[in-house]
């Protein structure tokens, strides 16, 4: 078996003509510029999102901690992707006429693969933490309010366990053999990636369904509280739950759409690989990096949702103070109108 694997490695050491044409093509260079732009934008908005969570937080403390950890993970993932693509584009210029020096050996990519796939899976399973954060906030509100950090840390630990388990299933024990065009490609001897993509997709679909259900319950609860309660604290908490559930729902749907680019996209491309030339396949594949796109969507949603919510609050406060005077007077007017 080892001898066969070594022979396979030696036979694939040099890039084919199609692979050489792809790696040195304008298309792959354009993909580098495009992804570099996405990554730089994600850095910028990650800083803005972290500032918003720190200084103008509209989320619960539990949700905020989960989002901050996910943002930090996204920065590591984007940095890893940037380093991978810089190495690839460097080789495409320097070794454009040396096909045997264009591909990367598995050992050349070992560190990048470690960071790339761990942060990739951690980003995917953030939907689990955010979904169950919403579940706990609705069904166990007292516990959620009293122990916000214990809740978020517990969910992040479970998220990490999922991440490590998936990494172990996909890459642990895979022989350090084989060559790949770009270091984020799965090793040639790793065989479980289709199963992993199917599992990730199942988790995300489940989380979307649950989050939409929780959002519906929160909206229904807020309407009931508005009709029956004069407590501003209770009304504020209900409104916060609706806003948070809405944001989480948007995040999970965007994560699903982006990561589906990787999951379904990679599986589909592999299924039709026999109908594509080597050059065509390797021109398309560099664009299919859904988590990189998802890591731009995450800070965008956090930042703009925070700005929008703050703007709505200011407008609402302005209306209340200009039309009804102070809050006490407003409540008295409501009481009279309901008598």
Swiss-Prot record:
Compartment annotation: Membrane
GO molecular function: G protein-coupled receptor activity
InterPro entries: 7TM_GPCR_serpentine_rcpt_Sra
Coiled-coil segments on the chain, per record: none
Domain of life: Eukaryota
Membrane topology: Multi-pass membrane protein
One Gene Ontology term from the biological process aspect of the record: sensory perception of chemical stimulus
Pfam families: 7TM_GPCR_Sra
Transmembrane regions: 30-50, 113-132, 151-171, 199-219, 249-269, 284-304
Keywords: Membrane, Transmembrane, Transmembrane helix
GO cellular component: membrane
Family: Belongs to the nematode receptor-like protein sra family.
PANTHER family, A to Z: G-PROTEIN COUPLED RECEPTORS FAMILY 1 PROFILE DOMAIN-CONTAINING PROTEIN-RELATED (PTHR31582:SF2), SERPENTINE RECEPTOR, CLASS A (ALPHA)-RELATED-RELATED (PTHR31582)
Stated name of the protein: Serpentine receptor class alpha-20
Species this chain originates from: Caenorhabditis elegans
Gene name of the encoded protein: sra-20
């Amino acid at each position: 078996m080892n001898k066969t694997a070594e022979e396979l490695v030696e036979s694939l050491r040099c890039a084919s003509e199609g692979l050489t044409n792809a790696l040195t093509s304008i298309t792959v260079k354009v993909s580098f510029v495009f992804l570099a732009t996405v990554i730089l934008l994600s850095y910028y908005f990650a800083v803005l999102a972290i500032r918003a969570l720190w200084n103008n937080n509209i989320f619960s403390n539990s949700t905020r901690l989960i989002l901050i950890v996910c943002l930090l993970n996204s920065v590591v993932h984007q940095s890893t992707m940037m380093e991978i693509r810089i190495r690839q584009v460097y080789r495409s210029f320097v070794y454009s006429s040396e096909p045997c020096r264009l591909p990367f050996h598995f050992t050349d990519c070992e560190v990048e693969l470690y960071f790339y796939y761990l942060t990739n899976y951690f980003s995917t399973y953030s939907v689990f933490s955010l979904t169950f954060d919403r579940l706990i906030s609705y069904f166990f509100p007292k516990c959620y309010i009293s122990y916000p950090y214990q809740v978020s840390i517990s969910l992040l630990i479970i998220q990490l366990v999922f991440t490590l388990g998936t990494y172990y299933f996909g890459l642990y024990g895979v022989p350090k053999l084989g060559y790949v065009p770009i270091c984020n490609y799965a090793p040639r001897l790793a065989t479980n990636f289709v199963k992993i993509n199917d599992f990730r997709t199942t988790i995300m679909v489940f989380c979307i369904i649950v989050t939409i259900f929780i959002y519906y319950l929160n909206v229904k609860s807020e309407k009931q509280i508005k009709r029956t309660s004069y407590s501003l604290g209770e009304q504020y908490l209900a409104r916060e739950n609706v806003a948070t559930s809405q944001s989480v729902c948007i995040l999970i749907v965007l994560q699903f759409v982006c990561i589906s680019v990787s999951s379904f996209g990679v599986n589909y491309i592999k299924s039709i690989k026999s109908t594509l030339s080597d050059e065509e396949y390797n021109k398309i594949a560099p664009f299919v990096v859904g988590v990189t796109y998802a890591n731009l969507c995450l800070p965008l949603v956090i930042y703009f949702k925070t700005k929008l919510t703050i703007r709505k609050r200011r407008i609402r406060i302005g209306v209340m103070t200009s039309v009804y005077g102070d809050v006490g007077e407003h409540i008295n007017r409501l009481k009279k109108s309901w008598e």
